[in-house]
Amino acid sequence: MKNFTRKHSTILIVEDIDWIRSGMKKAVEHEGYRAVEATNDAEALQLAEREPPELIVTEEELPTFYDLMSHLREHASLNSVPVAIVNPDAEDGAQHGDAYLLADYADITSLLAVLRY
């Protein structure tokens, strides 16, 4: 992944649980990035098509996760956008294809490492 310029980088957070999504948004914005929120794949795709983000953060347990990933990979202008996936069974820093894996949303340090990578 690339190193993101904070003031101009938009991070799309796709999470269906309000308090998790809100916490992630606060952490990302605290570090100087612009955060955009979506609760499902349809909302995420609509936002991403309107203004492609520099990074998408989502979780594998999102009910529409596989639909989201499928649509992103099929969409010409979005298939190169890096994705960070929260998967509790993953080891932080591992990569799965072109996606960066995070073990837990709560570990903000891991997310910030992705942003700086």
Outline where the language-model segments fall.
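As written
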Residues: S9, P53, F65, P88-D107
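Acidic, metal-coordinating helix/loop segments flanking the phosphotransfer/catalytic sites
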Residues: E37-L55, P63
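Two-component/phosphorelay signaling modules centered on CheY-like receiver
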Residues: I17-V36
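A short, hydrophobic beta-strand element within the central beta-sheet of small alpha/beta folds
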Residues: N79-E91
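Non-catalytic signal-transmission and effector/linker regions of two-component phosphorelay proteins
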Residues: M1-E15, Y66, S77, A103-Y117
